[in-house]
Amino acid sequence: MAEKTDYKATLNMPRTDFPMRANLPTREPEQLKKWEEMDLYNLVQRATAGRPKFVLHDGPPYANGDIHLGTALNKILKDIIVKHATMAGYDAPYVPGWDMHGLPIELRALKDMNIDRRKIDPLELRAKCYEYAHHWLNVQREQFKRLGVRGDWENPYRTVAPEFEAKEVEVFGAMAAKGYIYRGLKPVYWCPYCETALAEAEIEYNEKTSYSIYVRFPVVDPRGKLPEGSYLVIWTTTPWTIPANLAVAVHPEVEYGVYATEKGNLVVATALAEKFFQAVNLPAAEPVATLKGADLEGITYRHLLYDRVSPVILGDHVTTEDGTGLVHTAPGHGHEDFEVGQKYGLPVLNPVNDQGVFTAEAGPFAGMFIEKANPEIIKALDEAGMLLGQGKIRHQYAHCWRCKNPVIYRATVQWFVKVEGFMDIAKEAMNHVRWIPDWGYNRMYAMIDGLADWCISRQRAWGLPIPILTCSACDEPSFEPKMFEKIAEIFRAEGSDAWWRRPAEDFMPEGGLTCKKCGGRTFHKEKDILDVWFDSGSSHVGVLETRPELTWPADLYLEGSDQHRGWFKSSLLTAVVARDGKPPYKAVLTHGFTVDEQGRKMSKSLGNVVDPADVIKRYGADILRLWVASTDYRHDMALSENILKQVADAYRKIRNTLRYLLGNLYDFNPDTDMVERDDLLEIDRWQMHRLQEVIRKVTEAYREYEYHIVYHTLNNYCAVDLSAVYLDILKDRLYTSAPASRERRSAQTVLYHVADALIRMLTPILTFTAEEAYSHLPKPAGSPPTSQLLMMPQPDPAYLDENLAAEWDRLMELRDAVQVVLERARVDKLIGSSQEAAVNLYASGGEGSWAELLDRHLPDLPSIFIVSDVKLFVGGQSAPSGTYFGEGPGDLSVEVVRAEGEKCERCWNYRKVGAIEQHPTLCERCAGVVLSLNLDNA
């Protein structure tokens, strides 16, 4: 008896070493090692030299602690953009940077040293800070590399580098030369815990419980406008500022009423009277007199705690939204108070020291910390008969961005940038920038419009010193250009530590300095340091203009939406002054913050923090990268365990699609086996048309930075177009055709083009997986060693055929209708697999009938429906009304019956078998293929 033939061995089943299980946490580090061995960054830079430049300037993360989800999101977005730019034909260098000065690092260094900063030599403290910052630079560098981010990691920019510091001095000097740097007494944000001034960008607003008090000041001189026994009523949530009260402000156009009460004749805005009486538990009353705020100007009152007489003044900042419409004014503790006080020549009283403790000027409260003094001040007001009511409120209040404690407004002598002098120049520069999304322009405009002068001095040690020498005789600062040149020269050679090592004379230009005010020749160095936002805000000069591979301005800045008031703003302000009105960037892209699935901010207290290191450990960096691409970054970006699982599921579908494509290309050589367009089967030409549409959509989405569209397009293409339709239809042809037949090579040609295009389009996003797939893809001779050196695919017009696509779209519509009927037959167990079925189609044959289309494609229909046979009945044949029947599109009806014939042992279709004697269990097609393979064992 002849030995039975193993027909399975005659099938072209998929085979590939590209694993089904990704095992990314293990494989990704192996890939990183390979990239390191090939010196990937420099390899790419050499290969792209001479192309047009695309420069994304890295906003420097702070070198303090592990990266968090927001940092990871930011770096991944940048990497997607840079890699796409390379593959789109640009030379796209990426120089990562770090912000390495500043308060958080200094505080941590002091904590580690367990020492009071007043008792340590500044150079010793700075050395510790330098060491601490570089430790975290190295930690973060490895964490960023683990994300798959490609960059010049061995040569990053650092705001502590001598060359950077020298350039920053030059920027400062350029601003000073134009008169935009000055020293002055003004109220600024002050952190009594960190003992330093803060800029607006260093403030965050959090919930705080504060005292809410209503206070009456007895009128001294009513100037004939108020009755005897009148009181001015103010409301405040900062009782500690009452000792510094020097005026009461009213709005000139607001109506005020005089209300006769058991507490005297109380003056409040009529619009707020009802709320006021409720708040202080007084019976509602009608005013005995009304007058405009302008009538109250010049009236005086007595501050009973200090027996001080002060005036009523006018201020447009006064509103009737809350309180009484009369504003307690302390020029030493508020920006608006200070401004209006200057108009009236009020002194600036600031009875609070650097630590937030009252000085002797506060009288009985001297020595008390302001927050602890609040109850004592309230008690004193009550005893003096000034307190009308008290309570507590929850409200948004300014906090220090680093120590998270409440800050105060405090008038001190600080260094400022006179923003008002060039605000209009900055606004004009904004018109030459592309803002992504568009609302970024309005956000930025709001930050610049009416911006208060920028406080740039900090009372700390770890930072770039304010490069100013001041006359020791009259305290007049020097802005001599040659002085700035000398300071920059020394910093370039020695770093800014030289400021603490060298005497002031060393920083003077040749011939010394002469004070322009008093003629003095002796100068001393400024003790304050520069705001870190001045550091990073100067990076466009310190990096873009000093690194030969980069260009000024940058093509793109990309950061979170909080940077409109941070790096975007500080960079714009320094650039328009130092570089003659030009912005430092051509485009600014903004992304949202990371939140949990419910849209809540991530916090340890809520237990909803997602650690990128944990995600990488459990899922791999490519899952994190896919999440970044899948989410519309223009809004806040949600991540949770549930969302991670959804992303991982989408990743598996993409990976399985790649694996299937590669598995069917094991014997395909693109140099010798490619089928020309006109020789492709029609369904394959249709799929090539679909591929061009996908490429076109993805190309446009990449160009517009819309990565969520890239993701959804490719995800749907893999899951629907390929896996659910085309690849399903192809299986019979791929597996059962002769290996080198036109039918199989036609399919493989398409699979190669699809795999090649997918790898290219996925490389910027799934950077590890695309590289892994590329290593398993059959490649033409001369292909680059990494997918990152491939070019992005471009739509090929030769494959775009709208008429063909319209026909096949109709056939796919019919396929959907057939599958509905097949499923009913399967549920009722008429059939098991769809190959046990045959389909009968009934068409009317009239005008607009499907008959012509179906007749032309009749040989293709069994493979399209994945059934054993399809028959078409046109015109007079009446459609059945049996169980397995359904309406198709248009004039079609669909019937499913069991297929006739026997099951072919090789292809499993039901057809006539045994036509070829040597293979009695095979259909004629399969027997012919087997004979051609010379594998007959019969």
Curated annotation (Swiss-Prot):
List the subcellular locations: Cytoplasm
Name the keywords, alphabetized: Aminoacyl-tRNA synthetase, ATP-binding, Cytoplasm, Ligase, Metal-binding, Nucleotide-binding, Protein biosynthesis, Zinc
Main subcellular localisation: cytoplasm
> Does the entry feature the keyword Zinc, yes or no?
yes
Which co-factor is required?
Zn(2+)
Which reaction(s) does its UniProt entry say it catalyses? tRNA(Ile) + L-isoleucine + ATP = L-isoleucyl-tRNA(Ile) + AMP + diphosphate
Residue interval(s) of motif 'HIGH' region: 61-71
- Asked if the keyword Zinc belongs to this entry, the reply reads yes
Q: Check the record and name the PROSITE patterns matching this protein.
A: AA_TRNA_LIGASE_I
Q: How is the co-factor bound, per the entry?
A: Binds 1 zinc ion per subunit.
Any Pfam family hit: Anticodon_1
Q: Which CDD domains match?
A: Anticodon_Ia_Ile_BEm (cd07960), IleRS_core (cd00818)
By its UniProt entry, which InterPro entries does this protein fall under?
A: aa-tRNA-synth_I_CS (IPR001412), aa-tRNA-synth_Ia (IPR002300), Anticodon_Ile_BEm (IPR033708), Ile-tRNA-ligase (IPR002301), Ile-tRNA-ligase_type1 (IPR023585), Ile-tRNA_ligase (IPR050081), M/V/L/I-tRNA-synth_anticd-bd (IPR013155), Rossmann-like_a/b/a_fold (IPR014729)
Subunit structure, briefly? Monomer.
The family note in this entry says: Belongs to the class-I aminoacyl-tRNA synthetase family. IleS type 1 subfamily.
The identity of this protein, by name, is Isoleucine--tRNA ligase
> What gene makes this protein?
ileS
